[in-house]
Amino acid sequence: MSGPNPNKQPVELNRTSLFWGLLLIFILAVLFSSYFFN
């Protein structure tokens, strides 16, 4: 995440962190579901 002014857009950073958080939860859910089904 390279930018000229990273502190100028806190909303963008919040959206990025929220996106990665949801992605991590989705991956964990897929792993747990595959673990339970096998």
Curated annotation (Swiss-Prot):
Membrane as UniProt keyword: yes
Membrane topology: Single-pass membrane protein
UniProt key word Transport: no
Cystine residue pairs: none
Subcellular location as annotated: Plastid, Chloroplast thylakoid membrane
GO biological process: one example: photosynthesis
Pfam families given in the database record: PsbL (PF02419)
Record's keyword terms, sorted: Chloroplast, Membrane, Photosynthesis, Photosystem II, Plastid, Reaction center, Thylakoid, Transmembrane, Transmembrane helix
Primary residence: plastid
Annotated TM spans: 17-37
GO cellular component, one term: photosystem II reaction center
Membership in a protein family: Belongs to the PsbL family.
Entry-linked HAMAP family: PSII_PsbL (MF_01317)
Subunit note: PSII is composed of 1 copy each of membrane proteins PsbA, PsbB, PsbC, PsbD, PsbE, PsbF, PsbH, PsbI, PsbJ, PsbK, PsbL, PsbM, PsbT, PsbX, PsbY, PsbZ, Psb30/Ycf12, at least 3 peripheral proteins of the oxygen-evolving complex and a large number of cofactors. It forms dimeric complexes.
Function: One of the components of the core complex of photosystem II (PSII). PSII is a light-driven water:plastoquinone oxidoreductase that uses light energy to abstract electrons from H(2)O, generating O(2) and a proton gradient subsequently used for ATP formation. It consists of a core antenna complex that captures photons, and an electron transfer chain that converts photonic excitation into a charge separation. This subunit is found at the monomer-monomer interface and is required for correct PSII assembly and/or dimerization.
Protein name per Swiss-Prot or TrEMBL: Photosystem II reaction center protein L
Organism: Guillardia theta
